[in-house]
């Protein structure tokens, strides 16, 4: 997959104002993103989701973003107006959230929601929009697109709901897809099915994928490159195929805490942390 740079982030920092003082959620994160699959991994609170949200301008109101650069093609994402953001979000950069129950509108049919997402960025009539929506539902391996099109979110399973979310986010044909733990609420079998669908669509469309996860196995299987985050910092950047050769002790510790499938039932080690890792 070509790695021509689509997005360049330099020295990104995110600080939240709270009643107990400032919280530094992201500190000095830098990376370039081409037409590839980039994984961002780390424990809860490491700053990985906030990094993804900052790319789309979705940081909460009490958060302050600073960066030396956040460049998407010729657009400076640090200085976009609300009007310009509406042209970027969904159309050029999309984001899949963790659980479709909280992302889909419970009082609209699935078809109406996908059509709305498509017509927001494309001036087409209702018949063409419906045709595109049904095609997109078929593309995410839904066997009966017409039935799901006319269903409400509560009438489909978790795995089906996540396929619907993938369809909705991809129908505008964005260049970058940010997937924030898109399978964490699903069982393992459905998880792999959804990831395989997502992987196929990203490859076919020549898109860039930012896959945010705490699951090292999943990231190593589906990504080209990995950023490992700890307390707001990127402590290691490594090719996914070489993850088992990680050099940073934090990444090594995460790998050592994974259960092995070789019959060794020894007690898993406790992950140790050094204060210096958060000062990098």
Regions picked out by a protein language model, each given a short descriptive name:
Residues 7, 24-26:
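Conserved structural motif at the start of ABC-family nucleotide-binding domains
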Residues 64-76:
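Conserved ABC transporter NBD signature motif
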Residues 192-205, 217:
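Helical segment within the ABC ATPase nucleotide-binding domain
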């Amino acid at each position: 997959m070509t790695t021509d740079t689509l997005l360049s982030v330099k020295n990104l920092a995110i600080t939240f104002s709270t009643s107990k003082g400032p919280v530094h959620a992201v500190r000095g994160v830098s990376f370039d993103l081409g037409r590839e699959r980039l994984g961002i991994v780390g424990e809860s609170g490491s700053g990985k989701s906030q990094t993804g949200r900052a790319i789309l301008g979705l940081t909460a109101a009490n958060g302050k973003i600073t960066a030396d650069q956040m460049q998407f093609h010729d657009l400076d994402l640090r200085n976009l107006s609300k009007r310009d953001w509406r042209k970027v979000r969904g159309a050029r950069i999309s984001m899949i959230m963790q659980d479709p129950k909280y992302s889909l509108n419970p009082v609209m049919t699935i078809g109406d929601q996908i059509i709305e997402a498509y017509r927001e960025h494309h001036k087409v009539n209702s018949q063409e929009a419906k045709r595109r929506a049904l095609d997109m539902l078929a593309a995410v391996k839904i066997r009966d697109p017409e039935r799901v099109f006319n269903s409400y979110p509560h009438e489909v399973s978790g795995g089906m709901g996540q396929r619907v979310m993938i369809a909705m986010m991809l129908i505008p044909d964005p260049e970058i897809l940010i997937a924030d733990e898109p399978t964490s609420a699903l069982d393992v079998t459905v998880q792999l099915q959804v990831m395989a669908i997502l992987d196929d669509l990203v490859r076919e469309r020549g898109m860039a994928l930012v896959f945010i996860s705490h699951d090292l196995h999943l990231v190593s299987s589906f990504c080209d490159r990995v950023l490992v985050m700890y307390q707001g910092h990127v402590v290691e950047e490594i090719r996914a195929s070489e993850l088992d050769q990680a050099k940073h002790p934090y990444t090594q510790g995460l790998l050592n805490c994974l259960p092995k499938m070789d019959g060794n039932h020894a007690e898993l080690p406790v992950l140790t942390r050094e204060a210096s890792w958060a000062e990098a």
